Amino acid sequence: MNLARSGDAPQPRRWWSPWRIVGLVCVGLFLAGIGRFYDHRTGFTSLISIGDKLGDGKVPALKAVPHYVYEDSYGYDGAYYVQIALDPLLTGSELQTSVDNLPYRAKRILLSWTAWLLGGGQPFWIVH
């Protein structure tokens, strides 16, 4: 004989558990923090740290794409790796003059190839 009472039915789970709310707040804060770096003209390219002292030392494909440039700075490694990502086969002769210590940096090609693949080989999408 089944004497189950109506109050014994399983209760539906609440969507607003405290841990879920904390997780959603953390995701929201992370996205808001990353969103500060977005510019409608240059996208997220400020995260690459390309300096103006590179000047004419950029590969032509990078010069053709709008990107954020830090003034009075050489930039950081991202400035070189984005140029390698624009030509991951390293066939362009301009890479020799535009990338500092190319043999050393070419050994770390995974991120450059990943950017090239995700960008579909299109310079705008590779840089952004």
Locate each region found by the language model.
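Short, intrinsically disordered, charge-balanced linker/junction segments flanking boundaries
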Residues: 122-128
